[in-house]
Amino acid sequence: MPFLVRILTALAFGSLMTNTGVYAADRSPTITVGTQEVGLAAGYMLPHRLTKDHTTKQQGPAFMPSWMMTVTDPVGDRWYRGQVSLGAEMVYIQFQEPFLTHGVGFTPKIKYSFVALDRIRPYAEFAGGPFWTDLAGKIPEESSRFNFVLTAGFGVSYFLTDQTALNVGYRFNHISNGGTRYPNLGLNASLPFGGFSFFF
C-alpha cells in the first residue's frame, strides 16, 4: 500500500510541476461533447464476506487505466446538472491473500459527472465486463478462471487545469462467473482509489 501512495503522490506532484500557467480560481474547465479523457487509477481491494459461506479474505492492489468520451452537453439546471461519458477500462488486481494470484479484465464504463461546482466535480460510475483470474479452484468462492466483474462507485475530480484532474473515490466490486459453473459464491470487495485524468 505505501508503494501505491508513493506512485500517486509522485504523479500528482509531476502534474503540478508541468502546469505552466496559473489556474484562476473563478475559471471552470470546459468539457464539451467529444472531449476525451485518459486516466489511471490505483487502489487497494478490501474483502467483504457477505454470508457465512464466504470465507476467503482476498485483498491486494488494483490498477485501472481508462479511456472515456463525453457524449452529452450539461443537462439539468440544479445541483444534479451534469454530463454523461462513455468509455472502457482495463483492470488488473493482484490478489495477495490467501494466495498470490492475479486477475485482469476489460469493462465498458459509464460515468455521470456533476458540474455545478466548477473545478470540484463529483461523479458516479458503473462498469462491467469479462474478468480472468487464476483464483479458480484455490478458494471455495470461485470455480472457473473466466468470470465477470461488476463495479459501481462514486468519486470526486479536482481540476488542476482545464486538462488535468486529480481523482479520489470508492468502488464496490463483485466478481463471479455468472452461474456458468458451480460453486459460484463470488467475491465482493471495497476498492478505495486515487488517480489522475487528462482531457483533450
Where does each model-flagged region fall?
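Outer-membrane beta-barrel "beta-signal"
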Residues: 65, 186-200
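Residue-level signature of outer-membrane beta-barrel architecture
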Residues: 69-71, 112-114, 156-158, 198
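Mid-length scaffold segments of soluble, non-membrane domains
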Residues: 89-129
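Sequence/structural signature of outer-membrane beta-barrel proteins
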Residues: 45-51, 74, 91-97, 117, ...
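Cleavable N-terminal export/targeting peptides
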Residues: 1-32
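Transmembrane beta-barrel strands of outer-membrane/channel proteins
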Residues: 36-46, 86-92, 124-130, 168-172
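Short loop/turn motifs that connect adjacent beta-strands in outer-membrane beta-barrel proteins
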Residues: 24-35, 71-84, 98-100, 115-122, ...
